[in-house]
From Swiss-Prot:
Residue ranges, Extracellular side: 60-74, 148-166, 245-255, 355-362
Species of provenance: Drosophila melanogaster
Name the UniProt record assigns to this protein: Putative gustatory receptor 89a
GO biological process: detection of chemical stimulus involved in sensory perception of taste; monoatomic ion transmembrane transport; signal transduction
UniProt keyword annotation of Membrane present: yes
Bilayer-spanning residue ranges: 39-59, 75-95, 127-147, 167-187, 224-244, 256-276, 334-354
Amino acid sequence: MLRFPHVCGLCLLLKYWQILALAPFRTSEPMVARCQRWMTLIAVFRWLLLTSMAPFVLWKSAAMYEATNVRHSMVFKTIALATMTGDVCISLALLGNHLWNRRELANLVNDLARLHRRRRLSWWSTLFLWLKLLLSLYDLLCSVPFLKGAGGRLPWSQLVAYGVQLYFQHVASVYGNGIFGGILLMLECYNQLEREEPTNLARLLQKEYSWLRLIQRFVKLFQLGIFLLVLGSFVNIMVNIYAFMSYYVSLHGVPLTISNNCLVLAIQLYAVILAAHLCQVRSAKLRKKCLQLEYVPEGLTQEQAMASTPFPVLTPTGNVKFRILGVFILDNSFWLFLVSYAMNFIVVILQTSFEHINHGEI
């Protein structure tokens, strides 16, 4: 497989993507990812198998709530089933999108691997990447208490359905980790360029142009997946907030499982948004730095360059924007929009719940 010249988790992420069929290609030395026909056929068969199993998985997963000792309301069961359906659909869409764009994905992975040979992740970036990987592992291990408590009472068909459901749930989490790792790598490139002395301005502009093209390819390839990731994570957070507030108002307690799940989802989503925001900030700083240096081509004075050279040659190409499907830009302002929407949602839930209490409905 591809060997990144640093112990940073990117190699593990790539391997994990291949195991979960998010990277339907074969990797080998030296630093080459290739699409092969037999790998494509296996990926297509796996996707068709998972698609055909999806209704069975949802049916059996919904029946698992009857096997527990906890009494769930019909509203809670409906929300849980809708959340599971969303996870399944998003995971299948991610797998299908990568299968359809496997050649572009392989080329992008090759470019990122070559980039990482020259620009290694810093130890801070490595630390944050591993923390996010461990957070995904913690999210997966949260299902262990349920299996210990109700696993013995469940038939084998429901256990299989629960395992496949965990696979669908983990695909989105691992996908987000891959997006986070790729953005961290490109962010590290901007950080190192910002620290370098501008001895050759033409080379600096060339690097700025190459980073911009790479990020544009990255956003174009993953924009559908990022949109689904943000949508699915935000909906799951809203559902967990509803379950948390409903439990708190009716039973006057704090459900640790629900609160932990909501916190993990929020941290994972914000990590991706923050990395994209910092990447855009570093790109803007690099562009401003290039403009302040007043680059003049060799053999021309500044007056001659201003008079005879087209404007785009004298300036950087533009700012990096993580514009997702033309709907939103992945930055801190978008995160503040999500937070404000969530706060309004909490207020509506509390108001509705207290009105029901006053009318004796709870």
